[in-house]
């Protein structure tokens, strides 16, 4: 399990995005996904990022195969939840309501987006009443 959401830099997040999409990947595959045809320095950069992510608990390494295969140790939804809660804690005293209000106001939500949000609120209301 990851220590804290703030441990993930934007560059590390780009590596996690590849792993979320691929499920598992080698250093070479991640480097190719991020940089196209890779030079040794890019390969080394990806290895360093994976080492940092592993130390932080965000990725796992399978050493039983060669080359080693990496997989995400945190799901995208979990990281999103943690980051949003951290933002709510930092700016809104832990309340999600002001954060969500700010996110939704002034956005050009489609009719479908608004309907999905209404359905989610209805679902949450039903869960809360049972």
Q: What is the meaning of each model-derived region?
A:
Residues 1-18, 78-79:
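Short alpha-helical segments that sit at the start of domains
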Residues 9, 64-83:
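Short, cationic-aromatic polyanion-contact patches
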Residues 18-26:
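Short capping segments at the starts of secondary-structure elements
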Residues 25-34:
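Short acidic, hydrophobic short linear motifs in intrinsically disordered regions
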Residues 47-51:
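Short, hydrophobic-biased segments on the C-terminal half of alpha helices
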Residues 57:
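Glycine-centered, phosphate/nucleic-acid-interacting loop/turn motifs that mediate DNA/RNA or nucleotide
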Residues 61:
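Short beta-strand "wing" residues that participate in macromolecule-binding interfaces
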Residues 79-127:
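Amphipathic alpha-helical dimerization/coiled-coil segments
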């Amino acid at each position: 399990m990851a220590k804290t959401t703030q441990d993930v830099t934007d560059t590390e997040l780009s590596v996690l995005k590849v792993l979320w999409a691929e499920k598992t990947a080698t250093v070479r595959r991640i480097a190719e996904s991020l940089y196209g045809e890779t030079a040794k320095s890019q390969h080394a950069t990806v290895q360093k990022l994976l080492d940092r992510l592993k130390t932080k608990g965000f990725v796992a390494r399978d050493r039983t195969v060669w080359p080693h295969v990496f997989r995400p140790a945190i799901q995208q939804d979990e990281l999103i939840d943690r980051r949003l809660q951290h933002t709510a804690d930092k700016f809104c005293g832990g309340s999600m309501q002001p954060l969500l209000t700010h996110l939704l106001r002034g956005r050009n939500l489609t009719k479908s987006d608004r309907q999905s949000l209404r359905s989610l609120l209805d679902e949450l209301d039903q869960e809360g009443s049972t």
